[in-house]
Design a protein with these regions (language model features):
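Sequence-specific dsDNA recognition surfaces
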Residues: 2-33
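A short glycine-rich beta-alpha junction/loop motif
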Residues: 3, 40, 56-64, 74, ...
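Short, solvent-exposed loop/turn positions at domain surfaces
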Residues: 24-25, 95, 134
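Short, Lys/Arg- and Gly-enriched loop/turn segments at beta-strand edges
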Residues: 44-51
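Ligand-binding loop in jelly-roll beta-barrel domains
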Residues: 53, 68-73
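Glycine- and charge-enriched low-complexity intrinsically disordered segments
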Residues: 74-84, 91
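Amphipathic alpha-helical coiled-coil/heptad-repeat segments
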Residues: 108-156
């Protein structure tokens, strides 16, 4: 669960298990690129889509792979991160030291389900915004390098 942040999966820290153990524990299906994963505790409610990755990986005990057969995965990811869903999630969670939710209770929480066409429009919009954010981020990084070069030139 520590690798899943809101809308982002980090591969900075990785733990490895043997192929034999992987085959034993992954009896409920292998996660695929684009699947939506959700943390059920520590931290509660982080959600992201699985990015392109070069190897199989294990989904830990506090992570659920959400079914997306009827929903656009991008739409599902953002619906699960909405303020409305978070309020419902916190209302059904339990635990004094570590807050979490059981999968049966999670399955009873609802999200709005617009037509597939509207879900796809939303997903296309999110993709465009993400591309624009990436372009802006690259520009900021380039400007930062230029600033450092000028500072080096002026101040040695």
């Amino acid at each position: 669960a520590k690798n899943i942040s809101m809308h982002y999966m980090s591969f900075d820290t990785q733990e490895f298990i043997s192929k034999e153990n992987y085959d034993k524990v992954m009896t409920r299906g292998i996660p695929k690129v684009g699947d939506v994963v959700f943390t059920t505790e520590a931290p509660l409610g982080n959600v992201c889509r699985i990015p392109q990755f070069d190897t199989d990986f294990y989904i830990g005990q506090r992570i659920i792979t959400m079914q997306t057969k009827l929903l656009n995965p991008v739409y599902l990811e953002y619906a699960l991160s909405s303020d409305d869903f978070k309020r419902k999630l916190v209302g059904k969670s339990s635990g004094s030291t570590v807050t979490g939710i059981r999968s049966k209770l999670l399955g009873k929480l609802t999200i709005p389900v617009p037509s597939k066409g509207l879900q796809n429009q939303f997903a296309a919009f999110v993709e465009r915004v993400d591309q624009q954010k990436q372009t802006v981020q690259q520009s900021l990084e380039k400007l930062e390098l230029m600033k450092k070069a000028l500072m080096q030139e002026y101040f040695g």
